[in-house]
UniProtKB/Swiss-Prot annotation:
Homodimer. Part of a complex composed of A30, G7, F10 kinase, A15, D2, D3, and J1. Interacts with A45. Belongs to the chordopoxvirinae J1 family. The keyword Protein biosynthesis does not apply. It is found in: Virion; Host cytoplasm. It comes from Fowlpox virus (strain NVSL). This is Protein J1 homolog.
Amino acid sequence: MAHPHQHLLTLFLTDDNGFYSYLSEKSDDEALEDINTIKKYMDFILSVLIRSKEKLENIGCSYEPMSESFKALIKVKDDGTLVKAFTKPLLNPHSEKIVLDRGYTSDFAISVIRLSSKSSYILPANTKYINPNENMYINNLISLLKRN
């Protein structure tokens, strides 16, 4: 019997836009609930990766940034303010059919679900947006960057 999140996680992990098509058919509340479910599993996977990276570093293996190929999400403007910097174009959620991969991606999704349910990893609380103008740490960081 399939876990209730198996198909959702498989859709998300598949390298196409089917996940967006799926979300576009849901109500806002259902879509948000599904996104939070995905976020929970991504937090778990990131936790596993970070702990694994730390193990490599503990034995002297230098492991360069794991997110090297990603675009910047924020940038610092000349006046020191942080702004979002999205470079990906908008997508049409109805442009692709929903195809559920029943191969290795589905197997991986099942494994993540099972491993996360038995794991002793303590995951961080839900991430919240921080307004850079109201955060003293970020303001101090910006002032240091402005001086240099």
